[in-house]
């Protein structure tokens, strides 16, 4: 079983994403059975009935088999649009609402399984941290462009750093509480950021 794909995608793109998700499912099954480190790209390709070159072409690395999805690029596109008309937090909420709808319509088990490896597998977690650093820089540039600030300004760095780090914390919390909806956890996280809280009270 593979997650549902967004209807707005073209047929060719949907076929490609479907093939990629089938490879990801095969990889997750093998990782669960044999351990992440014991499974090779070649073994994943055989299980998915594709060539190793196809796996490398689609994903590049074994870590990418876990981390790849369509949500981060979609979120950045939505944020760019929303920042034209809204302040930072409103733009984030609106962009996340749109993107999370696609995520919620996908497969809960698929996303839970992927995120468990992000949390518990050091190599995947390290690669994800690099991705978050890159996203941090992209959002900082975006926010600076829309506000007239320098992306290196402390205000920009703190705002974007708080958002990205808090989103990662929300995902980790969701992995530990799979009975919860990720959208609800993210919404609660955004409330905490926006309202602020006294660190001395924790």
What are these regions (language model features)?
Residues 59, 70:
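DNA major-groove recognition helix of helix-turn-helix
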Residues 122-147, 154-161:
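Amphipathic alpha-helical packing segments from all-alpha helical-bundle domains
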Residues 46, 60-61:
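Residue-level detection of the helix-turn-helix DNA-binding "recognition helix"
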Residues 110, 118, 141, 153-172, ...:
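Hydrophobic alpha-helical segments that form the core
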Residues 77-113:
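Hydrophobic alpha-helical connector segments
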Residues 1-3, 179-202:
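C-terminal peripheral helix-coil segments that are non-catalytic and often amphipathic
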Residues 1-34, 38-53, 67, 74, ...:
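Basic, helix-initiating cap at the start of DNA-binding domains
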């Amino acid at each position: 079983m593979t997650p549902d794909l967004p209807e707005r995608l073209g047929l060719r793109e949907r076929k490609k994403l479907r093939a990629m998700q089938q490879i990801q499912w095969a990889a997750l099954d093998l990782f669960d059975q044999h351990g992440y480190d014991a499974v090779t790209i070649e073994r994943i390709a055989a299980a998915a009935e594709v060539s190793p070159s196809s796996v490398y072409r689609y994903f590049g690395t074994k870590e990418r088999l876990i981390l790849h999805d369509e949500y981060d690029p979609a979120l950045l596109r939505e944020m760019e649009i929303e920042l034209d008309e809204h302040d930072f937090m409103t733009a984030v909420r609106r962009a996340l609402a749109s993107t999370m709808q696609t995520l919620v319509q996908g497969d809960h088990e698929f996303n839970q399984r992927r995120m468990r490896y992000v949390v518990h597998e050091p190599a995947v977690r390290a690669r994800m941290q690099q991705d978050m650093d890159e996203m941090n820089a992209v959002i900082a540039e975006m926010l600076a462009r829309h506000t007239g600030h320098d992306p290196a300004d402390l205000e920009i760095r703190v705002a974007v750093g708080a958002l990205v780090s808090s989103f990662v914390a929300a995902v980790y919390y969701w992995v530990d509480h799979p009975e919860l909806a990720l959208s609800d956890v993210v919404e609660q996280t955004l409330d905490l950021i926006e309202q602020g809280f006294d660190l001395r009270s924790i």
